[in-house]
């Protein structure tokens, strides 16, 4: 049925992580008509590749779930094109990601708040919104850092496989600490991770926010609805046109909110004449607002896997045997338990790569299995691996449309490894990871390094390996960043979430982040959307909560850490 001439108070372009939050929160006002337009299909309850946590590797690269983006040839990665999976389904990338929940370090948000006009995005103002969205089963009811009644149900990784405990102990032996909660008082250290898995199923943003709200009469959700154009009268957005089932539909809107993510949002802005004027003219597009920051400041996390052979038969490697998969799948279908009921990213840590760094700049994900994200397993009977990479690369990329065609994918480049600081941190990251994996606590299991292998030792050999094997951690952000109007590269007003120079066009998604955070970015995107919902609705914001958190050089180095007995063989 065509929605031609139908009018909505809010049209949200994108039913991903941020769009799901907004669809729920904005439709709480019963007198407001809300439309969510998702270009992908529905996240069906019966779809095992979405709902089964351990099936997370299957949607990537599959056109039914993934937009299958790729960068242009990366000039500092040997000319490689780096594949980028983005969710083409309700829930967006929260329906195909690794389900890891990490807020980032509190100092990330202190950095957000440094520019004039960004003061309400410091940690004290963001913390109440993190708590609002969380239901943290792994935290004590009195834990003032964590939320206990939110829609996102979080499972604390049990990390019962002996490889996890040995890895945590190895971190302590290497001179680091163990922390009870990387989202609590102390991020720095090693310990279990929270995951967006509830009762053995993926807890996506759409499952948590959008599906419970769909019974409301004032909320409409359209899937397979690809927005081709935003309509304007001067500086005011008046509606959108979208294509569904081969037909074009035009609807009117009092407000248009872009929640398409770090790729689609800057693409739509540029197609709408919002961006660098000279570049837009070169593509035959009449400039509407000159905002040279659209598509710039692009950030991402790059990562590699350091893989080891495991001497003891304790890893999950046998679960990759195709003969065992039917049993594992049936166990999950009937009981929601077993190897398929976990994302297996149950623990890891955050450390500083050197003593000059104020707070952690390296992230580790540990897996009791040796396998690539595409499902390619190492040729060993048993293995394990650690994912590692710098969190604050100062390399910056860009996204630029290639033409006026909304269906043509844009030109994407992240410029990985383009700075000396970036390369320095990468060498440190690999050396820190190897040091941890070589500690005595790992001796009972350490059967030797598979990848990159002992032949990779010098700084240049390490960088060559990263250039060959580095993959995106799938955390693109900051391509339409928040910032005051005095910042020539800012795109979004941090007080209103409106695009600078526009009256009723807003951006709420990862593209609006001013800087990436230390960790997986799904939790920060949910927080940003929760906070933005109050801004858009004109509600009084939640009261800031000024709570002390661990700072290196300020607190005792052991404060908030768990005492671990030294490993004794």
UniProtKB/Swiss-Prot annotation:
<dbReference type="Pfam" id="PF05199">
    <property type="entry name" value="GMC_oxred_C"/>
</dbReference>
<dbReference type="InterPro" id="IPR000172">
    <property type="entry name" value="GMC_OxRdtase_N"/>
</dbReference>
<dbReference type="InterPro" id="IPR036188">
    <property type="entry name" value="FAD/NAD-bd_sf"/>
</dbReference>
<comment type="similarity">
    <text>Belongs to the GMC oxidoreductase family.</text>
</comment>
<dbReference type="GO" id="GO:0008812">
    <property type="term" value="F:choline dehydrogenase activity"/>
</dbReference>
<dbReference type="GO" id="GO:0019285">
    <property type="term" value="P:glycine betaine biosynthetic process from choline"/>
</dbReference>
<comment type="function">
    <text>Involved in the biosynthesis of the osmoprotectant glycine betaine. Catalyzes the oxidation of choline to betaine aldehyde and betaine aldehyde to glycine betaine at the same rate.</text>
</comment>
<comment type="pathway">
    <text>Amine and polyamine biosynthesis; betaine biosynthesis via choline pathway; betaine aldehyde from choline (cytochrome c reductase route): step 1/1.</text>
</comment>
<feature type="active site" description="Proton acceptor">
    <location>
        <position position="475"/>
    </location>
</feature>
<dbReference type="InterPro" id="IPR007867">
    <property type="entry name" value="GMC_OxRtase_C"/>
</dbReference>
<dbReference type="GO" id="GO:0050660">
    <property type="term" value="F:flavin adenine dinucleotide binding"/>
</dbReference>
<dbReference type="Pfam" id="PF00732">
    <property type="entry name" value="GMC_oxred_N"/>
</dbReference>
<keyword id="KW-0285">Flavoprotein</keyword>
<dbReference type="GO" id="GO:0008802">
    <property type="term" value="F:betaine-aldehyde dehydrogenase (NAD+) activity"/>
</dbReference>
<dbReference type="InterPro" id="IPR011533">
    <property type="entry name" value="BetA"/>
</dbReference>
<keyword id="KW-0520">NAD</keyword>
<keyword id="KW-0274">FAD</keyword>
<dbReference type="GO" id="GO:0016020">
    <property type="term" value="C:membrane"/>
</dbReference>
<feature type="binding site">
    <location>
        <begin position="9"/>
        <end position="38"/>
    </location>
    <ligand>
        <name>FAD</name>
    </ligand>
</feature>
<protein>
    <recommendedName>
        <fullName>Oxygen-dependent choline dehydrogenase</fullName>
        <ecNumber>1.1.99.1</ecNumber>
        <ecNumber>1.2.1.8</ecNumber>
    </recommendedName>
</protein>
<dbReference type="InterPro" id="IPR012132">
    <property type="entry name" value="GMC_OxRdtase"/>
</dbReference>
<keyword id="KW-0560">Oxidoreductase</keyword>
């Amino acid at each position: 049925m065509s929605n031609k001439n139908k009018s909505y108070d809010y049209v949200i372009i994108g039913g991903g992580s941020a769009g799901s939050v907004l669809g729920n929160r904005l439709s709480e006002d019963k007198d407001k008509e809300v439309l969510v337009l998702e270009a992908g299909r529905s996240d069906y309850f019966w779809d095992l590749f979405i709902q089964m946590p351990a099936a997370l590797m299957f949607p990537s690269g599959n056109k039914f779930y993934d937009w299958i983006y790729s960068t242009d040839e990366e000039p500092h990665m040997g000319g490689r094109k780096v594949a980028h999976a983005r969710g083409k389904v309700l829930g967006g990338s929260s329906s195909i990601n690794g389900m890891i929940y990490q807020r980032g370090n509190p100092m990330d948000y202190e950095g957000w708040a440094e520019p004039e006009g960004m003061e309400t995005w410091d940690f004290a103002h963001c913390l109440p919104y993190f708590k609002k969205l969380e239901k943290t089963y792994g935290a004590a009811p009195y834990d003032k850092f964590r939320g206990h009644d939110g829609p996102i149900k979080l499972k604390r990784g049990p990390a019962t496989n002996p490889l996890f405990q040995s890895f945590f102990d190895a971190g302590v032996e290497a001179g680091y600490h163990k922390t009870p909660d990387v989202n609590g008082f102390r991020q720095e250290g090693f310990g279990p991770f929270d995951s967006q898995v509830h009762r053995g199923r993926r807890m996506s943003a759409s499952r948590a926010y959008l599906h419970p709200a769909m019974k409301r009469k004032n909320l409409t959700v359209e899937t397979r609805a690809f927005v081709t154009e935003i309509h304007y009268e001067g500086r005011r957005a008046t509606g959108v046109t979208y294509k569904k089932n081969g037909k074009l539909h035009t609807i009117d809107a009092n407000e248009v909110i872009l929640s398409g993510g770090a790729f689609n949002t800057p693409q739509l802005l540029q197609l709408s004449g919002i961006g660098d004027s000279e570049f837009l003219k070169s593509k035959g597009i009449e400039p509407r607002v000159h905002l040279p920051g659209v598509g710039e400041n692009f950030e991402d996390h790059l990562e590699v896997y350091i893989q080891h052979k495991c001497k003891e038969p304790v890893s999950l490697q046998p679960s990759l045997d195709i003969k065992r998969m039917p049993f594992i799948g049936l166990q999950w279908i009937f009981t929601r338990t077993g190897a398929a009921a976990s994302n297996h990213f149950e623990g890891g840590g955050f450390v500083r790569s050197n003593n000059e760094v104020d707070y952690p700049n390296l992230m580790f994900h540990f897996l009791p299995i040796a396998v690539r994200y595409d499902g390619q397993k190492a040729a060993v009977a048993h293995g394990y691996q650690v994912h590692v990479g710098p969190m604050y690369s100062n390399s910056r990329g860009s996204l630029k449309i290639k033409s006026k065609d909304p269906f043509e994918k844009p030109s994407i480049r992240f410029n990985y490894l383009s700075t000396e600081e970036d390369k320095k941190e990468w060498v440190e990251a690999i050396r820190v990871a190897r040091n941890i994996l070589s500690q005595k606590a790992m001796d009972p299991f350490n059967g030797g390094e598979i990848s990159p292998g002992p032949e990779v030792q010098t700084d240049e050999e390490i960088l060559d390996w990263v250039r060959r094997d580095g993959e995106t951690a799938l955390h693109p952000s900051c391509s339409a960043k928040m910032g005051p109007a005095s910042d020539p590269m800012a795109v979004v007003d941090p007080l209103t979430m409106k695009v600078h120079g526009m009256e009723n066009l807003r951006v709420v998604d990862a593209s609006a982040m001013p800087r990436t955070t230390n960790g997986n970015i799904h939790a920060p995107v949910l927080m940003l959307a929760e906070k933005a919902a109050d801004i858009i609705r004109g509600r009084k914001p939640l009261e800031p909560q000024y709570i002390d958190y661990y700072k290196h050089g300020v607190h005792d180095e052991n404060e908030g850490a768990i005492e671990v007995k030294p490993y004794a063989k």
